[in-house]
Curated annotation (Swiss-Prot):
Its main location: cytoplasm. It is found in: Cytoplasm. This is Peptidase E. It comes from Citrobacter koseri (strain ATCC BAA-895 / CDC 4225-83 / SGSC4696). Transmembrane segments: none annotated. Keywords: Cytoplasm, Dipeptidase, Hydrolase, Protease, Serine protease. GO terms for molecular function: dipeptidase activity; serine-type peptidase activity.
Length: 229
């Protein structure tokens, strides 16, 4: 399988998805036809989100079609060479994808050779479940099971920073709480600017920041770019 799972879409001082474009180009391998799932977009229309994504990827020769705009989305996914899943609200993304019957077709397409690209919520959707999302508002997606294309849980936008005087939990504390109730999970705290590329059965970590892996009852393990899972 070919996956590109990004923690986020925008870095300080860079345009939207600018840091991801070289990675996308590297993994395209001649693929040009893409479908885009805009369902995580809550404060922007799905048409606008699709147009924005299409404009960014056009210089790479990728043609993007919004899956919400086609008469037969299952057939469109089956025919696509690239499946792109945008960030935003993970609950809304999973709810819409499940209700439209798109989860199994996406898995089948990627297993047949389509490239999967997802950032933030789109990276969450590639995991076994969405239980490591950070998102609000919460809508009911009728279950948290997701695509399961990547075997570990990703926590996008990972940071342990807290504003001075803030008394809420750190991100690590929240992940630790999850591992108490679900000790079978392994969670990757993926900071902004980092990504995971899967190619030819090998998953490789990229990006400038330290990533952390969390397992129940164990110390967090720091990982740097180039680590292979």
């Amino acid at each position: 399988m070919e996956l590109l799972l990004l923690s986020n879409s925008t870095l300080p001082g860079k345009a939207w998805l600018e840091h991801a474009l070289p990675l996308v180009a590297e993994q395209l391998h001649g693929r040009r036809s893409a479908v885009f799932l805009p369902f995580a977009g809550v404060t922007q229309t799905w048409d606008d989100y699709t147009a924005k994504t299409a404009a960014v990827l056009a210089p790479l020769g990728v043609s993007v079609t919004g899956i919400h705009s086609v008469a037969d989305p299952v057939a469109a996914i089956a025919d696509a060479e690239v499946v792109i899943v945008g960030g935003g609200n993970t609950f809304q993304l999973l709810k819409e994808s499940r209700e439209r019957g798109l989860l199994a077709p996406i898995v089948a397409a990627v297993k047949r050779g389509a490239l999967y690209i997802g950032w933030s919520a789109g990276a969450n959707l590639a995991c076994p479940t969405i239980r490591t999302t950070n998102d609000m508002p919460i809508v009911d997606p009728q279950g948290f099971d997701a695509l399961g294309l990547f075997p570990l849980q990703i926590n996008p936008h990972f940071t342990n920073a807290l504003p001075e005087g803030h008394k809420g939990e750190t991100r690590e504390q929240r992940i630790r709480e999850l591992l108490v109730v679900a000790p079978e999970l392994t969670v990757i705290g993926l900071p902004e600017g980092n990504w995971i590329q899967v190619s030819k059965g090998q998953a490789t970590l990229g990006g400038p920041n330290t990533t952390y892996v969390f397992n129940a009852g164990e110390e967090a393990v720091p990982l740097e770019a180039g680590h292979r899972f």
